[in-house]
Amino acid sequence: MFTRQQYSAGINYTMPFLWVNNNDYESVGREIEKIKESGSNAFCVESRIYEEFCGAEWWKLMDFIVGKAESLRMKVWLLDDKHFPTGGANGAVERNPQLRPKYIVSDEVDVRGPVRRGKVLLQTRPDARLYCAAVLRQTGNETFEYYKDVTDCVVDGSTLKVDLPQGYFRVCAVSVCTGYDESGVMIDMLSRASVRLLIDEVYEPHYARYKGTCFEGFFSDEPRFGNGVYNGALYRGGIYGGNAGEKGLAYNWAEDMGDCLARRAPGYERGHIVSLWNDVKGVSAGVRVAYMDEITRRYGENFSGQLSAWCRERGLQYASHII
């Protein structure tokens, strides 16, 4: 246990949030003093929500906060976005739609064979393009064997022509789309360029203004992939608790993800991607592990790794907790 004397000597292991949403300097100053009196020598500024974040009034308020902290020999951290959760990049993603995250979703229909010269009308989305179509043969209650890739049998982007033998089958059409979660347009955690928007919009201007002061670093608040159940837009239902195999779940995607899965999962072929949603014998386990390993690696390199490296190079601290 650390004593009040140790905290007063400059040992900091806590940094409570200082929520700011207006220009009441007197109240902000009083809250900073109370934080100091509690034994904490650091705090983290959070916009909740300060509409002019990174605007003229914001800089006046931050100048006051940093000045007050220096007078009390305190350290200042910043929650690194306009609002919770980290990922909006202060609205920069909306201005750069090409850097929005991509997702894959699967539309499925169960069919009883035999079927000859059958046609299946695929669900189409205005923001989506077909990645692949595949057929699974049902072997039990929601268990399947991989049957075949039928992407080449799709005509006009919306109609699948297919012949099927005796049995029960599931036809899956996987599309790549863009979407929104409940928090708005977010950066793409699989894209280094997309994450860079956060640095350019928030990190760079704060570092330039407060370099050499008591400004300590940045804190990312619950950054996430933001994927959920897809119904034309992503909603909270699966954002925090989604699991591989969950029906309707949207999975984060990158243009080269298929090639990466082929390297990670022996025997992988394009149509195997449907095993992210379905229990496919001899396929699902390998594909799901390969997929999670790949997106975890990219998240670490592009988000946490890029931000922390940027901070280290400038003598700043970086912290986060991740959903």
Where is each model-derived feature located?
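Mature extracytoplasmic enzyme cores
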Residues: M1-Q6, Y13, S27-E37, G55-V289
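N-terminal cofactor/phosphate-binding cores enriched in small/glycine residues
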Residues: P16, V20-S47
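Second-shell loop/turn segments in exported
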Residues: W19-N21, V185-M186, D293-I295
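Acidic-and-aromatic substrate-binding clefts and catalytic sites of carbohydrate-active enzymes
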Residues: W19-S27, R48-K60, I323
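Aromatic-lined carbohydrate-recognition surfaces of secreted/lumenal glycan-active proteins
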Residues: V76-G87, E216-E222, M292-I323
